[in-house]
Design a protein with these regions (language model features):
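Glycine-rich, flexible beta-strand/loop modules in the N-terminal catalytic cores of phosphate-handling
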Residues: 91, 96-182, 262-272, 276-281
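Short glycine/threonine-rich beta-strand-turn micro-motifs
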Residues: 353-362
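Long, charged amphipathic helices and adjacent flexible linkers at domain junctions
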Residues: 294-320, 365
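Conserved helix-loop functional segments at active or binding sites
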Residues: 91, 116, 142-147, 167-180, ...
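Conserved small/polar residues in nucleotide/adenosyl-binding loops
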Residues: 363-369
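Extended amphipathic alpha-helical scaffolds
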Residues: 2-130, 315-329, 337, 343-345
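Short, hydrophobic beta-strand segments
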Residues: 8-16, 186-188, 192, 264-271, ...
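Mobile "lid/hinge" segments at catalytic clefts and subdomain interfaces of large enzymes
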Residues: 1-11, 212-304
Length: 370
């Protein structure tokens, strides 16, 4: 069937169908080809059942040939070119911090919420040394981001994995509990998807944290590079900022996040047996160039340093330390003393066994004296 299909739908026709920078247009073009084949093979049920698989294989072969032999990407970009970028902060007025980051037809909005340290996530796992998690990053990939209407059944393996990658990328730049006594939660909502949503969520989260007044050490950006290989070790093309089609039909998705000064997280998905040292070196170099471009030309012009205060609607926290032997006096008999302070001032007071006292106000712009 494949040979007959290629004779009917020429390689030139398939190349024309996939050569567009609009995902919906490309999908419509491929669907039109499938409809022509369905009409041609209407009397052959066996071949009708194979149309989807055959068109996918033909599309993959065409895209790989365009990239490897012609050095031409499906959306017309140069091998090293990044898709159009856009960033903004304070998209949502009522939240503690928000930001939007867009790369081509991939768009991510991240919302930051701040809370007291007592609201950190409690962990019940094998590692007994880690019982709480102060920074939480959640990644949501709703069906509407790819133009579908399937029901949401909670986070899957993909959402959990992408959220964990973005979380690891940002943890190295977060302030300590002493510097910033807050629990921090970021939620990345994928508004539109055409590849590299995990890296987009890293960029959006970095912007959102700075907009929320979290004193991060440096902004973090993420980028993915792809790979298409030929017959020999030297026959390959590395693609900067891969879109969905290049991810599906390529051999690698190499994700790198970091600051101007270094890398904070790496993840590689690979479909071939291995990589040469030259490929690895070039891939890391490409991500460095792209990261510098994103940070310098897109993110930093929007917000270059964290705001010097948390937002109007974020809780205000004052931290102090007392002698652990005095904790019982602060609490009082059956909590009488501490509850009286809470009732009088309207604040929340958290005391741990080491004598750290966090006074949290959700209603006052400044903390009352207690």
């Amino acid at each position: 069937m494949y040979d007959d299909m290629v004779a009917f739908i020429t390689p030139e026709a398939m190349e024309e169908a996939v050569f567009t920078d609009d995902k919906q247009t490309r999908e419509a073009n491929i669907r039109a080809i499938e409809e022509k084949l369905e009409e041609r093979y209407a009397e052959n049920e066996e071949w009708l059942a194979q149309i989807g698989e055959a068109v996918y294989a033909f599309q993959k072969k065409t895209v790989r040939k365009m990239i490897l032999k012609d050095h031409k990407r499906p959306d017309g970009r140069d091998i090293k070119q990044i898709r159009p970028l856009h960033a903004e902060v304070d998209c949502l007025p009522r939240v503690h911090g928000s930001a939007l980051f867009q790369r081509g037809q991939t768009q991510v909005m991240t919302v930051t919420t701040l809370g007291s340290l007592s609201e950190a996530q409690r962990l019940d796992g094998i590692d007994v040394t880690e019982t709480t998690k102060r920074y939480m990053h959640h990644y949501n990939f709703p069906s509407y981001s790819v133009g579908e209407t399937r029901p949401s059944r909670g986070p899957g393996r993909r959402e959990i994995g992408h959220g964990a990658l973005a979380e690891r990328a940002l943890v190295p730049v977060l302030p300590s509990e002493e510097e910033f006594p807050y629990a921090i939660r970021t939620v990345s909502e994928i508004m539109e998807s055409n590849g590299s949503t995990s890296q987009g969520s890293i960029c959006a989260s970095s912007l959102s944290l700075m907009a929320a007044g979290v004193p991060v050490k440096a902004p973090v950006a993420g980028i993915s590079v792809g790979l298409v290989t030929g017959e020999g070790d030297d026959d390959y093309i590395i693609l900067t900022d891969i879109q969905g089609l290049e991810d599906f039909f390529g051999d690698m998705d190499f994700k790198v996040a970091g600051t101007h000064d270094g890398i904070t997280a790496i993840q590689m998905d690979i479909k071939i047996h291995g990589l040469t040292p030259d490929i690895i070196r070039e891939a890391i170099s490409r991500t460095k160039e792209a990261r510098e471009h994103i940070l310098t030309n897109v993110m930093e012009p929007v917000i270059s340093t964290p705001r010097d205060h948390v937002g109007e609607y974020a809780p205000k926290i004052m931290q102090m330390h007392v002698d652990p032997d005095k904790i019982s006096e602060i609490i009082g008999k059956q909590g009488k003393t501490i509850n009286a302070i809470i009732d009088e001032t309207g604040v929340k007071i958290d005391i741990n066994d080491e004598g750290r006292v966090d006074t949290v106000s959700y209603t006052h712009l400044t903390l009352p004296t207690t």
